[in-house]
From Swiss-Prot:
Belongs to the conotoxin M superfamily. GO terms for molecular function: ion channel regulator activity; toxin activity. GO terms for cellular component: extracellular region. The keyword Disulfide bond applies. The cysteine framework is III (CC-C-C-CC). This is Conotoxin In1746. It is found in: Secreted. Its main location: secreted.
Length: 15
């Protein structure tokens, strides 16, 4: 999965 804002546990989608 992908989450915004980024947290530990999911793929960081902050690009």
């Amino acid at each position: 999965c992908c989450e915004w804002p980024c947290h530990h546990g999911c793929i960081p989608c902050c690009y």
